[in-house]
Amino acid sequence: MQIRYFLALSLLPNIVLADEPTTTEAPSLQCVVAPPVSRSFEDREALTGISDDQIVIISDHSSVAYNNQAEFSGDVSFSQGLRHIAADNAVLDQKEQRLNADGNLIFKDELFTVTADTLEAQMSTNNATLKGAQYWLHGQQVHGDAEKLQITSDNNLLLTKTNFTTCPPGDESWLLEADMIKIDSKEEWGEIWNAKLRIANIPVLYIPYMTVPVSDKRKTGFLFPSFSTSTTNGVEVSTPYYWNIAPEFDLTFTPDFMSSRGLYTKTEFRYLAGEQQNGQFNVEYLGSDSKLTSNADRYLYHWSHQGAVNKNWRVRSDYTDVSDNNYFNDLNSDVNQSTDNQLSRIGEASYFERDWDFNMRVQDIKVLGEDEKPYQVMPQLNFNYRSADIFNTIDFKFNSELTNFRHQDNEYNTATRLHLVPSLIWPIQGPAGSFTSEVKLLQTQYWQQNIDEDSTLNDSISRTIPQARLHGQVNFERATQLFDEQYRQTLEPQIQYLYVGYEDQSNIGIYDTAQLQEDYYGLFRDRQYSGLDRVADANQFTLGFTTRLFDQTNREKLKFSVGQIMYLEDSKVSIDDTYEETAQSTSVLAAELDAQLYNDWFVSGSVQHDTETGENKKNEVTLDYRPSSDRLLQLSYRYVPDLLNTNTNDQVDISQAGVRTSWPISDNLYFVGNYYYDLNESRNIETYTGVQYESCCWALRLSYHYRIKTNYDDDLSESIDGREEFESGVYLNFVIKGLGGSGPLGVDDMLNEGLFNYRKPLYLRN
């Protein structure tokens, strides 16, 4: 079992680009850390008509000596601009421009409040030294003690023999002690030398140098290190370094030493390009992975970019590459999750006008663990035109696509495809229904190259397919009563007739085409396959209806849909042209349900049932109990037959049941857990259990996970059998709150831990 203890001391801000608008959620719990207030401050604030450079002194008693020294006593208030000093006694040397004060001393300006035993201030330079000080940063939870506190002329703080915390006074949950701390008020950042972290008054960590934020402002420097140990990776030490290059650029470099694997480095560079574009680069590298017998180098490259060039042009790019199929399984990448098995590489530029648009795209998809590689789109050009209300009744659309398919393996054939689709639509809209008539002409031209001599493919193919579609829907409504409650019920039947002409397409290769799902909304599609390499002939009716229940406040309480296709003729087109399908008179019966059963109980489900064979093609159901936003209990089941196992190329049935919960044990203590079980294999495939305690200044999370791993064949291991089938681990996270952008751990991210992330399954219109 993998055992991992992770100490995440999140003294770090949520690093964002400075020019990028952000919102920071307020912590759910905040410590009340209030600095002391002197009555003399209120007396000073009551005075008006005083400029910032004038000095105001208020006291019960005063005297002036022959040597230009003035002495004040009894509730002394000394003010200049935004700086205020309250004390029992004060001496002002006008010649030396020096002020000394003691006795119940309080210093305050716009950034911090300090109490101290003594104060010595140089008014000409705005420097001040306070001894025996306690300090509070305004607008933050940060406060602490210092043997000596110096305020510089530019309003920075220099603290000697000091400490700080974000917990309330008297709460020693955590405390950071240091020989010296410098707080830059302009940069809103702190530098710390020779720091010692105490948790529950026990020293747990020594740090010779570190930087921390005192606000959300970013600054170059080392971020707080993280430490972990595991039986898989050994001892891990990560020390991120953040470089604030410019307002529009920043970089984070994270060396992560793993005793079982070696030095793993992660670099992230982010940028803003103008006002409407942004992107980032990621480079991750592990040299000579000592965990593998081959000691192979492992790496990742990633680039993403998106935005608008002007009001018409949009651009987007995304590229990721890894060294091996199991990169995400073995390493904690910042780019993808361990369950991701596809890397999409895409570059796209689009131009938009009111009546037309144009798009250019190149795409390559890398599928991890599969020997057969998909075709590359190099490139694809799309042009679309639309004109509404021709003769005040008819809409005209013209869609076109020119695609060049290439393959990394030279043994595969390649192709260029031109697809043109003019269409006429006659929509009729009424207050209680609609009827749409549509005709299309699908004209496609293929030029195929590198064809084997024994292949059935042709060099040049022209395909012309007519299509007609009629779709009508009526909305009925009535008042009804259910369980002594008044509701408004709708009945929304719809019917569609679809005709698609037949043409033999066995001489066309498969480049980007796959079977589409037959859910309820898919029954009313005009196509059976994605892509354009196969256009299934059709002569069919689709019947379906949806019914809804609305309460008296117009909140949707139930939605149920069911539908089925009736085939007038058998389709003669399939992806596998050698496979003869069994003639069926109907499609699957597809039904979907979303309902609020009672107060806090919700159910959601779908089924695809073959009425001719009596078998279910797919079904899933979830039952949710949500009495409040932080309380959840979810039961789920899903069944999918004949799913392809990419490792073995076998067909497998998926039959899985699960339970997921999030529940507060007390005001500060939460429990999150999930459990998923494979009914066919009779085994646990995932367990996650976590408890989290959160106070106003710190949070602690302890969690355990056990889950099946998705391992792939690759060149780095002799066989897939040598890899662990399951992964388990224990995690301990400790988070400090109240500094900069640091906030609560939150429960939502715990719900999303694991293979089966939580998703709210309800689609009621509320």
UniProtKB/Swiss-Prot annotation:
Keywords: Cell outer membrane, Membrane, Signal
Keyword Cytoplasm applies: no
BP-aspect Gene Ontology terms: Gram-negative-bacterium-type cell outer membrane assembly; lipopolysaccharide transport
Gene3D superfamilies linked to this entry: Lipopolysaccharide (LPS) transport protein A like domain
InterPro entries: LipoPS_assembly_LptD (IPR020889), LptD (IPR050218), LptD_C (IPR007543), OstA-like_N (IPR005653)
Localisation per UniProt entry: Cell outer membrane
CC per GO annotation: cell outer membrane; transporter complex
Signal sequence segment: 1-18
A Pfam family it matches: LptD_N
The keyword Signal appears for this protein: yes
Family: Belongs to the LptD family.
Record-linked HAMAP family: LPS_assembly_LptD
Subunit structure: Component of the lipopolysaccharide transport and assembly complex. Interacts with LptE and LptA.
Function in brief: Together with LptE, is involved in the assembly of lipopolysaccharide (LPS) at the surface of the outer membrane.
Protein name per UniProt: LPS-assembly protein LptD
Gene giving rise to this polypeptide: lptD
